[in-house]
Regions:
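Short, surface-exposed beta-strand/strand-loop-strand elements in extracellular ectodomains
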Residues: 403-414, 526-535
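Short proline/glycine-enriched turn/loop motifs at strand-loop junctions of beta-rich domains
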Residues: 400-401, 522-525, 636-638
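Bacterial Sec-dependent N-terminal signal peptides
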Residues: 1-23
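Carbohydrate-active catalytic/glycan-binding domains of CAZyme proteins
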Residues: 21-355, 359, 393, 462-529, ...
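Exposed beta-strand face motif in extracellular beta-rich ectodomains
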Residues: 390, 443-445, 568-570, 657
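Extracellular carbohydrate recognition and processing domains
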Residues: 273, 412-442, 535-569
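C-terminal outer-membrane/trafficking sorting elements
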Residues: 612-660
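Extracellular beta-rich ligand/substrate-recognition surface
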Residues: 359-377, 385, 424-428, 487-501, ...
Length: 660
């Protein structure tokens, strides 16, 4: 349940005056190199490949710090010279898991011609050094010939439809983007459908037919086609010539028709622009959408005009609206619940507004200056994995003499935020924040920030999303993790050695914790440990799965031991050890302390929906005043509702003695 606006405002006011935080945190782009990148999620992390490096493989546990495993081939395979005799390298890999193996579809081509071919290589395991790792080339899949074909066999991308069939999109210029059906077993073109479907094409004379790099993904029963438009690959001294951008459309069938948000067919020149040049980030394109546990992400390259002027990659969330259209979220800079405002979708009412500026004290070294004019707007699409009450930690600078005001709209709900002077412009110490209460949905959320001119102004750096915990953390609200997944019933599953991340957990909203319980099924041994800050951080709560009591519906309740006085804002890591197979976890439940009043029962359990009032604090944490409770001095059995991930309750009758 929501805690109510009064409760959230209470926490916000308490922090606004006294907040200190465990550590300053400034985002920093990792500048991972890559061109035409492809990524895949596997159980222990991520794999990444890109163009012109003989299918060089990188792996990462967190999609931020990457390990180079070198090239997976020594050069162009011999078969490829039959179709592209003058090819000079391997382009545009696409990593996809099908038929029990990891396959990399790649292409060879003669630049500027249609003498091109697509082939693939495969391995059972994608982690070097593990059992089953080792690449085998399977040769030719599809080809085109210059002077004969009006499309080009490059830039392959594989997708699985809702019926279990596999398809491969490809193409560049000419007739644009094509689609063929694949045989899942062989990996080659299917024998039961030899059609080459034209699914996207630039038709205007001005465009020159410049469309390539298709990527397909299914979401909520519809198919999304992302393509790259315009001029690519000019970098270094020629970076200003690059006009590359990312467009998309969607369809109800994998074979199309794909239409943009305005209803125009992509096969007739349509397409909605998702990403194009902004600030230092030139030519964001050549990307691929992929499924990452509980979110869809998009990896693409760009050229850094303020740095080395060469290619690097960004990984972003794709954020879907309620009517299932895609918007592009933040580049991933190491955290899931933070948004750098300079990476938002910027609408300028006048030229010179919303200027991306540099500062050594700004997160990632950049911020938005001149947030001045009514009608200018910053839109931040965000994927949120746990629905509920949040505080938006609004990091700003106001070098004026009086407070500025901004309009903050969260999923259509507007509020006005006051931003007092901070003493200087362009500097952003961690104390220069205000807290904005908001209720967020699970899935796509859309935050819009606008100046509300009153003659005073404020610059913006970053928004952090802090989740307020009343009595429950749902396991399936995790931000990411290793050796974890969501089942078809949306339940959280974890294997031995796995962990899940819960960022920015506000623990000050918990008061007088009596017991902590974890809902579990499908496991009777091993331990779940909740840790502070990292996967091997200090243990906060330990839940021994061998000590459980049956709740019903297959669920058991495990009583956890640990620090019942936990406070502050924490990143919590849920870690698993000693588990056989896979454990299904429900909610982590914080039960209020059971106390007595005059040796007699005094009333009802404290409700998770009760509001709270702020209490002054000098400790740097948020202090919450005791909640008022109703009491009638009668022995009345109260019912404590335990809920599984589907919201079904397993009621356990208990008796409370409440002190007030």
């Amino acid at each position: 349940m929501c805690m109510g606006l009064r409760g959230m405002l209470g926490i916000a006011m308490a922090w606004g005056a006294t907040a200190t935080f465990a550590a300053d945190w400034y985002a920093k782009d990792n500048l991972q190199p890559g061109h035409d990148p492809s990524m895949i999620r596997f159980e222990d992390g991520y794999a990444l490949m890109s163009t012109n490096n003989n299918l060089q493989l990188w792996t990462s546990e967190d999609a931020y710090t990457w390990k180079d495993h070198r090239s997976t081939v020594s050069g162009v395979p011999q078969w490829a010279y039959t179709y592209a005799p003058k090819t000079e390298g391997i382009w545009a890999p696409d990593i996809f898991y099908m038929n029990g193996e990891y396959r990399v579809y790649y292409c060879v081509s003669e630049f500027g011609k249609r003498n091109s071919a697509i082939g693939y290589q495969a391995t059972t395991s994608i982690m070097p050094g593990s059992n089953g790792y080792g690449w085998k080339d399977h040769g030719h899949v599809f080809h085109t010939k210059d002077g004969t074909d009006k499309y080009n066999a490059i830039d392959a991308d594989v997708v699985k439809d809702t019926e279990g069939n596999y398809w491969m999109a490809f193409g560049s210029f000419g007739l644009g983007i094509q689609l063929i059906k694949l045989d899942a077993t062989t990996g080659y073109q299917a024998s039961d459908d030899k059609t080459v479907y034209n699914i996207a094409r630039r038709t205007s004379k001005e465009s020159g037919g410049a469309e390539e790099g298709p990527s397909l993904i299914e979401h909520n029963g519809q198919y999304f086609l992302f393509t790259a438009w315009d001029k690519c690959c000019q970098q270094g001294a020629n970076i200003e010539q690059t006009t590359y951008k990312t467009a998309y459309g969607r369809a109800d069938k994998v074979t199309g028709p794909y239409k943009d948000r305005a209803g125009y067919s992509m096969a007739s020149g349509g397409g909605t622009i998702l990403l194009e040049r902004y600030g230092r980030y030139v030519g964001p394109g050549g990307g691929e959408a992929f499924q990452d546990l509980n979110r869809v992400r998009f990896v693409h390259h760009y050229y850094d005009n303020a740095g080395d002027k060469y290619n690097h990659i960004h990984i972003r969330d794709v954020v879907f609206t309620e009517d299932n259209w895609a918007e592009m979220g933040q580049p991933f800079l190491g955290r899931y619940l933070s948004a750098e405002v300079e990476h938002g979708a910027l609408t300028r009412a006048v030229s010179g507004d919303l200027v991306i500026s540099s500062s050594s004290t700004a997160s990632n070294g950049e911020y938005l200056a001149y947030v001045n004019t009514e009608g200018s707007k910053i839109r931040l699409p965000m994927n949120i994995m746990q629905a509920g009450d949040y505080l938006l930690r609004y990091r700003y600078a106001n070098g004026g003499d009086a407070a500025a005001t901004h309009k903050v709209t969260v999923n259509g709900k507007l509020q006005t935020v006051t931003l007092p002077p901070t003493g200087s412009w362009g500097t952003f110490p961690e104390k220069s924040v205000v807290m904005v209460p908001a209720t967020l949905k699970r899935g796509g959320n859309f935050i819009e920030l606008e100046p509300s001119p009153n003659g005073n102004f404020a610059e913006l750096d970053r928004i952090d999303f802090l989740r307020i915990i009343r009595d429950t953390i749902p396991a399936n609200g995790f931000d990411n993790g290793i050796r974890v997944r969501l089942t078809k019933d949306d339940e959280f599953a974890i294997k031995d050695g796995g962990y899940a991340i819960f960022e920015n957990v506000v623990l000050d909203s918990l008061k007088d914790i009596g017991n902590v319980f974890l809902q579990v099924k499908n496991a009777s041994s091993g331990k779940i440990v909740i840790r502070d800050g990292k996967k091997d951080g200090t243990a906060v709560f330990t839940c021994d799965l061998s000590n459980s009591s049956l709740m019903g519906g297959g669920w058991s309740a495990v009583k956890c031991s640990g620090d019942m006085g936990l406070r502050g804002i924490k990143d919590l890591y849920l870690t698993a050890s000693g588990i056989s197979g896979e454990a299904i976890l429900g909610n982590l439940i914080f039960e209020p302390m059971r106390v007595v009043c005059n040796q007699e029962p005094c009333g009802d359990p404290i409700s998770s929906s009760s509001e709270v009032a702020p209490e002054s604090s000098s400790s740097g944490t948020t202090s919450i005043a005791p909640r008022a409770v109703r009491h009638d001095n009668a022995m009345v059995p109260a019912r404590k509702a335990y809920r599984d991930l589907k919201g079904r309750s397993f009621d356990k009758q208990i008796r409370y003695r409440v002190m007030f």
